[in-house]
């Protein structure tokens, strides 16, 4: 089997790039002849089509990337398999995707989104995202690399470090976590809440709003926002430095960092919805808060990134649930349980590590990819 993997290559620290890069690594370790290419580079892709002649192309992205992941290779008569995430709804390319022999999606929730918005599901298979469980491992708090992370973030050795990581923090549920911490503040052990966000123009105003919320709640002295650029090499140490990973995300098609936190032996706070129903086990590897609110959308303004002219108004036949809000009181209760009980944190962390290795290791995912392609397309 010869496979061309299309993604954000060379890989940035982002989730989609990591998703593609770990599949590539897993395939190569299995002995599969696999090569990477940037999903937007028409010239590079055509070069591979001509000399490599891949049996199959797998492309990482979402429905809006269909021209790059599917249409380009179809002009050359090569089988293309998009491996898709979801952004809450699907608003174009239904006929093109429905006609494909195979579509991969990152969770059962993503599959439901695509079926809700026009696909039959007959050609959709769930393939979860891989995790490098050799890098994301439990580490001792006294390890100088771990102690240095905590010290640099202003976290004392005896403080409970709660961590959220994302492009921005609000979309990962930071507002709900802050409100929960404000409820617990005077009753809880000493704590520090760290939000690691990616430096980009769209998040600057969001970060200010988040910090204003912390001030309004009276917990701003215990909330730290860090916006430095970091590589994937740093992430295992950042996650291993925390005591609790909190990400009751508002929109989560899979939840890669939640799995990485579990792989580091950390308990996770999530929400009982979306991709987290696939990745986390309530009461065992994580605590999943109930959904308190569903946010529905009647219309959206789209542009060329979605295959429309700029400013196109797309009206849904029925309002779509596009994201969720977790129960603040559930989060508060679960945080208190974990903050007060080191043994519970350790036990849930061990279960999380075990599940991450068994179900989400990148080698497991690569093997599953080969099995699906062989069964569905008869390519070996």
PLM region spans:
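Nucleotide-activated donor-binding/catalytic signature segment of Leloir-type glycosyltransferases, i.e.
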Residues: 207-230
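Aromatic "clamp/platform" in nucleotide-sugar-dependent glycosyltransferases that forms part
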Residues: 250
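Short hydrophobic beta-strand element within catalytic cores of glycosyltransferases
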Residues: 267-270, 280, 287-289
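Carbohydrate-associated surface elements
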Residues: 109, 130
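A short, well-ordered alpha-helix in the C-terminal region of glycosyltransferases
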Residues: 316-319, 330, 336-337, 344-358
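Conserved donor-binding/catalytic core segment of Leloir-type glycosyltransferases
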Residues: 156-172, 178-181, 194, 319
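Short alpha-helical donor nucleotide-sugar binding micro-motif in glycosyltransferases
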Residues: 237-242
């Amino acid at each position: 089997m010869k496979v061309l993997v299309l993604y954000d290559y060379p890989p940035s620290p982002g989730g989609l790039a990591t998703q593609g890069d770990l599949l590539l690594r897993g395939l190569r370790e299995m002995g599969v002849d696999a090569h990477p290419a940037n999903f937007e580079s028409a010239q590079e892709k055509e070069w591979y089509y001509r000399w490599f002649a891949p049996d199959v192309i797998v492309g990482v992205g979402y429905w809006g990337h269909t021209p790059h992941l599917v249409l380009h290779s179809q002009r050359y008569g090569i089988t293309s398999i998009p491996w898709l995430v979801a952004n809450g709804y699907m608003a174009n390319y239904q006929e093109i995707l429905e006609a494909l022999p195979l579509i991969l999606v990152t969770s059962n929730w993503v599959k439901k989104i695509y079926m809700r918005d026009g696909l039959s599901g007959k050609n959709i298979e769930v393939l979860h995202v891989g995790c490098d469980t050799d890098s994301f491992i439990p580490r001792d708090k006294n390890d100088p690399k771990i102690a240095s992370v905590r010290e640099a973030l202003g976290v004392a050795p005896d403080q409970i470090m709660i961590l959220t990581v994302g492009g921005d923090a609000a979309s990962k549920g930071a507002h709900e976590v802050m409100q929960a911490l404000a409820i617990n503040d005077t009753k809880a052990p000493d704590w520090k809440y760290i939000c690691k966000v990616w430096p980009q123009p769209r998040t600057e105003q969001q970060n200010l709003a988040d910090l204003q919320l912390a001030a309004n709640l009276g917990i701003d002295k215990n909330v730290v926002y860090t916006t430095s650029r970091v590589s994937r090499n740093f992430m295992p140490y950042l996650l291993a430095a925390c005591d609790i990973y909190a990400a009751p995300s508002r929109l989560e098609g899979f939840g890669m960092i939640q799995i990485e936190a579990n792989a580091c032996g950390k308990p996770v706070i999530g929400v009982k919805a979306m991709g987290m129903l696939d990745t986390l086990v309530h009461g065992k590897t994580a605590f999943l808060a109930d959904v308190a609110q569903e946010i529905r959308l009647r219309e959206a303004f789209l542009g060329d990134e979605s295959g429309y002219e700029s400013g196109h108004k797309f009206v849904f036949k029925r309002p779509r649930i596009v994201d969720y809000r977790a129960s603040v009181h559930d989060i508060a209760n679960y945080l208190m349980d974990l903050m007060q009980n080191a043994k519970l944190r350790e036990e849930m962390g061990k279960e999380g590590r075990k599940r991450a290795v068994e179900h989400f290791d990148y080698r497991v995912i690569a093997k599953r990819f080969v099995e699906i392609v062989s069964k569905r397309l008869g390519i070996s």
